Amino acid sequence: LTACGTGPMMTFHAGDVQVVRGVTNELIERLMNKGFSPGHIFDTTGYTYTVTPFSAEGMKLELEDMMAEAGVELLYHSVVCDVEYENAVINSVEVYGKNGKRCIESRMFVDASGDCDLAFLAGLETNKGREADGKCQPMTMNFKVINVDTDRVKEYIMNNNDEFPRLKSDLSKVTRAPKLSIGGYVNTLKKAQKTGKISFQ
């Protein structure tokens, strides 16, 4: 969430009903209290029910605070590099960080690497991608643009709604949204591809 620029979290709702709460919603409330998130707002891209924008830097700070409050010892810039296990039970993991290697013993380990690092090192069977060819979903590639005239963007959307097919059912979302996220410019993109200004598959 904080490293890849994926923007908002989606979604905490199924229609009008909030279905995700717990510690995740506690995090959002804390972010809102510090001005790092507007909270749950309706989705203007048309992908889902609601989105929850947040400041990546603000979230880093708040997650760190929550960990400190819970008594968690954080190991920065560290990765698991080896696992000691016996009879399908992990006894310890070896972590490599800025201060070298460190052995950590525990009765329980949770693999939160996102890549099955711990499971793989422990000899468990892991799979990558879809069964047919092992290919994975393409990663989202985002970048930030500053000093955008959002009023002009909204005006363009309202006057060129064929460029934004996901918004056709309710263009009023564009003017009502506290934060604007859109998927579109489809004709502009096709024209740029056709003229060779951009090229991708």
Spans of model-derived segments:
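Short, hydrophobic/aromatic-rich segments at coil-to-beta transitions
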Residues: 87-93
